[in-house]
């Protein structure tokens, strides 16, 4: 009988051990399963985080490419309007620019004696109807006639050279905002009887360079490109006779030189 009792006890102990082992195994399996599920979720999350920046980057690149294509301005086939004083009226550099850049056409509406303030009369919706590029070179007569310079803060209503430039910019933007506006600083010129000549000061103690700097300053303020012929054309006091017929108006060599400078500058501006 004692033997039977011992056997019974052993059976109970073995059963308890078996149940405990099975329970432990099931718990371990559950934890491993949870671990696998957690790892899977973590992997999927990392994939999503990695792909999202790539997708955003692709979208960003598309936007940049689209912006670039919208801003691109092709010079070929465009119509250019040249506004200026007597130096521009009697010159052929505009036609040479047309040939160098393969423009559709060039209209030269320059006149003797024009000053910056008189440009307003040449800028209106009708005059700019078919124009893609407006190119203005004026300032020599303002210098010789002693136009007051004013300050960079002068608006179009102020009677000064700074104010005149701002008024011209405002008029062009209003008449045809999509047209490209470009200013040229005036060329240096030699002795002309009866008027001040570079590098002399005028009757209000201003040099041609002061008017050139004013053009650049106002254009910079308005984000308008400037082709600095005064400093970059290569026409200087010592070689003016080589490039002009009378110390001011351009000869063939002068027109070639100016046309080359303008064409190269326009290509850089609208590259």
Task: Identify what each model region corresponds to.
Residues 127-130, 175-176, 269:
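Glycine-rich phosphate-binding loop signature in dinucleotide/nucleotide-binding domains
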Residues 165-169, 212:
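Generic structural signal for well-ordered alpha-helices
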Residues 188-271:
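Catalytic His-Asp segment of secreted/periplasmic serine-dependent ester chemistry enzymes
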Residues 137, 184-185:
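Alpha/beta-hydrolase-fold catalytic nucleophile elbow
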Residues 98, 172, 218-219:
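A generic structural signal for well-ordered alpha-helical segments
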Residues 103, 175-180:
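A short helix->loop->beta-strand "cap" motif at the edges of active sites that frequently abuts
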Residues 73-83, 87-164:
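Conserved SGNH/GDSL esterase-like catalytic core that processes O-acyl groups on lipids
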Residues 1-83, 88, 99, 267-271:
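N-terminal secretory targeting modules
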């Amino acid at each position: 009988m004692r033997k039977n009792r011992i056997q019974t006890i052993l059976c109970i102990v073995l059963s308890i051990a078996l149940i405990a082992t099975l329970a432990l195994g099931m718990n371990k399996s559950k934890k491993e399963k949870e671990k696998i599920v957690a790892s899977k979720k973590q992997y999927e999350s990392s994939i999503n985080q990695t792909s999202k920046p790539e997708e955003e980057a692709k979208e960003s690149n598309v936007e940049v490419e689209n912006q670039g294509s919208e801003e691109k301005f092709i010079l070929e086939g465009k119509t250019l309007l040249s506004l200026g004083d007597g130096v521009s009226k009697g010159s052929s550099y505009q036609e040479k620019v047309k040939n160098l850049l393969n423009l559709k056409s060039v209209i030269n509406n320059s006149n003797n004696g024009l000053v910056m303030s008189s440009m307003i009369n040449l800028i209106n919706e009708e005059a700019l109807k078919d124009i893609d590029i407006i190119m203005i070179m004026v300032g020599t007569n303002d210098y010789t006639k002693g136009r007051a310079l004013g300050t960079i803060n002068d608006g179009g209503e102020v009677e000064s050279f700074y104010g005149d430039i701002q008024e011209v910019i405002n008029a062009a933007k209003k008449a045809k905002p999509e047209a490209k506006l470009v200013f040229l600083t005036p060329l240096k010129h030699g002795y002309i009887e009866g008027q001040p000549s570079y590098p002399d000061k005028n009757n209000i103690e201003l040099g041609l360079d002061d008017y050139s700097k004013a053009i650049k300053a106002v254009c910079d303020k308005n984000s308008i490109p400037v082709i600095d012929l005064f400093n970059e054309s290569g026409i200087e006091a010592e070689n003016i006779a080589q490039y002009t017929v009378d110390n001011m108006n351009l000869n063939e060599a002068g027109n070639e030189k100016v046309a080359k400078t303008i064409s190269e500058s326009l290509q850089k501006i609208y590259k």
